[in-house]
């Protein structure tokens, strides 16, 4: 049985609605054949935007959010101590935002991961679905609607995550490439060694948000996108990777190694791998999963144990256990690199 089924029975049911009155929800108990009966246009989405000194491009980002075809959207902005005009720009949008409410809160000022974590666990943020958002991208108009349409086919109690490819654009907005097109299925075995998509493409339903919030209450994480992918697949949730680029990721001086399309970015990641940075990230991910073992399915727990053991002992033992665990990256080259990194004890 997927562990999310046990979790939803314990999930806190009281919810705070900040702007609109709560919509009456069906009292019918969910079962595997019970579809989400709330019409897609009635699904309220909370956009969780983390900001810090983003005045240069945040206006274009906000323009693309307002242009979304989905009608019900609340914008939550957690500012991590901006010293430029970011806060003033966001506040100027309050009167223009005609999709719902705009709320601004103070971030924890401990980095972007902690900033997103603060919003994930914030019980004041109440919605049917939640979308992570950066401060300098451009969303395609149907980015939210596409995700909601996919989710409509599932029981509302199943943790769901939608993500997609990204197009990469220059500082001036010209598209210069796309992130790699992945073809392997999303799974926990993939999530253990790879984050499949950027957080700026992720939308999760309420069941997934509650699950990730529970898991995040007792641990910090490396990045919100990777952690969300790990937790949802560990608990038996469903992940959809859309091959279409639904977000244009802006490449600029402050994030030159953030995209997947430039050789500079790839070389930088390779350098971090062999410096042991990836091993440190894996340590943190495994530590977070260990304290949340109760959410793991039996299969995920078995895979986690094998993968954890594969990082210890002699070379042949490590490679044997790694293969037995079944973990994989999305490309053949990536999986070969994974095994090479294991040989050099860099994961």
Where are these regions (language model features)?
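C-terminal subregions of glycosyltransferases and related glycan-biosynthesis enzymes
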Residues: 217, 221, 227, 248-347
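Basic polycationic patches enriched in arginine
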Residues: 10-15, 23-29
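Nucleotide-sugar donor-binding/catalytic module of glycosyltransferases
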Residues: 31-261
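Generic low-complexity, intrinsically disordered sequence content enriched
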Residues: 8, 22, 39-41, 52, ...
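Compositionally biased, low-structure terminal segments
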Residues: 8, 17-19, 58, 117, ...
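Acidic, Ala/Val/Gly-enriched low-complexity intrinsically disordered segments
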Residues: 6, 19-20, 30-31
